[in-house]
């Protein structure tokens, strides 16, 4: 019976690791055509409301400069001007297409991640027994470690996530999550998140050391502070 529970728990752990990837891949493919049709049939007019975006403005300014150039060369042949108008029209359609594809990409990835979160939450609730078994294994493993080893791992993880050299790692991690949700790259937002998250984690960790470790294992706190110094 215990072997069966152990196998079920390990299978549950493996499914938690691979399930998000499978859900994302499946829903991306199944929702892509629906989101594209919905956007193209009902939301195409939003383009003209969102045209204030900087990258779209920049491209249309370039087109305006071409139009000014057209005015300057009116004495040129009518055929040349007609070709110029056709080129501007094609470029405008291309800008609209790129803009719409960006919006579809954002909606698709955001929807997929929300669905993935809901499914994983329900899966975690249904697999509560397996989570309890995995938690007991983890606690037993950690309990059997010496205080020195525990302090070493705590120091390593804190330096890795909230240490002086962790900024670049946070930039990559937050940038990956930000991109995975389909949002366009924004240096100001990413910089703000990189500044906020390590501070919050550092505060929570110090509070945990003060409230929990001091009560459970004072010797571990002493070793940790000695190694940290």
From Swiss-Prot:
GO terms for cellular component: chloroplast inner membrane
Predominant cellular place of this UniProt entry's protein: plastid
Membrane topology according to the record: Multi-pass membrane protein
Biological-process GO terms, alphabetical: potassium ion transport
UniProt xrefs under PANTHER family: CHLOROPLAST ENVELOPE MEMBRANE PROTEIN (PTHR33650:SF2), CHLOROPLAST ENVELOPE MEMBRANE PROTEIN-RELATED (PTHR33650)
Family the UniProt entry places it in: Belongs to the CemA family.
Name of this chain's protein: Potassium/proton antiporter CemA
Organism: Daucus carota
Lineage, broadest ranks: Eukaryota, Viridiplantae, Streptophyta, Embryophyta, Tracheophyta
């Amino acid at each position: 019976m215990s072997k069966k529970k152990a196998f079920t728990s390990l299978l549950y752990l493996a499914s938690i690791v691979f399930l998000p990837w499978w859900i994302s891949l499946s829903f991306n493919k199944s929702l892509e055509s629906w989101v594209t049709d919905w956007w193209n049939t009902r939301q195409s007019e939003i383009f003209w409301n969102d045209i204030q975006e900087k990258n779209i403005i920049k491209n249309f300014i370039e087109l305006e400069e071409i139009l000014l150039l057209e005015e300057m060369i009116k004495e040129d042949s009518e055929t040349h001007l007609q070709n110029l108008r056709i080129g501007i029209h094609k470029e405008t359609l291309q800008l609209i297409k790129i803009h719409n594809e960006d919006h579809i990409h954002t909606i698709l990835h955001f929807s997929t991640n929300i669905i993935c979160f809901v499914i994983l939450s329900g899966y975690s609730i249904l697999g509560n027994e397996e989570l309890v078994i995995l938690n007991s294994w983890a606690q037993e493993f950690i309990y059997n470690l010496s205080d020195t080893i525990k302090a070493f791992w705590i120091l390593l993880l804190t330096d890795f996530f909230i240490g002086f050299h962790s900024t670049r790692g946070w930039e990559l991690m937050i940038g990956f999550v930000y991109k995975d949700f389909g949002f366009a790259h924004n240096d100001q937002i990413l910089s703000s998140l990189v500044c906020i998250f390590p501070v919050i984690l550092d505060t929570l960790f110090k509070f945990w050391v003060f409230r929990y470790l001091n009560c459970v294992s004072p010797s571990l706190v002493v070793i940790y502070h000695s190694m940290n110094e």
